[in-house]
Amino acid sequence: IDDTEFITYQIEAQTPKKVRYSIFNRINTGGLSLNEQEIRQALNQEGLGVKFLENICSDPNFKKIVGISSKRMIDRELALRFIAFKLNNKEFNFNNMSDFLDESMENLDQIKNENKLIELKKELIETLIFSEDILGEKHRFSRSLAIKTKTKTLNRSLFDVITVCFSRIENKNLFLTKKELFLKNFIEIIQDERSEFSK
């Protein structure tokens, strides 16, 4: 034991969050490795964002429509993805989605206006309900919408596109009257193996 070498990492309070994420990812080996959202939860557990995402994901409509387990925080990531795009609706200036969500998690902690948070949750839940009106029950944001042989595995890219775009529709009643035309074109996009949704 006297000759055993230990490697320790000391993270100061002023250490930038990006460095903390980097260190956490480097030492996140062995056993059951944490996924990216679990790391965000761990590094921001004292922040408002963690509680807010939990509040969204415990909503009965969210649980019913998204239909994904909260065991590995994937539901929290989905809620965060929607919020990230709503808070950053300008040009995407990030190298990857992970960095985008890391920063968005921090930005979420900075929102002090409770009405803003209430509105974000309301917008997501209403959008999820609208997605059921358009796509049908139990669509689960999966490619099985267009390819019946596919299992109903949630596709994150589909979730992003559907929720963010549907949330921006101003006249939803008019859109509902045109939903068959939308579905025809949307299914063609999903069936295209070159599209982002094929991944």
List each model region and its residues.
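Basic- and aromatic-enriched surface patches that contact anionic nucleotides/nucleic acids
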Residues: 1-106, 176-177, 183-184, 191, ...
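C-terminal subdomains that position terminal phosphate/3'-OH groups for nucleotidyl transfer/ligation
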Residues: 79, 85-199
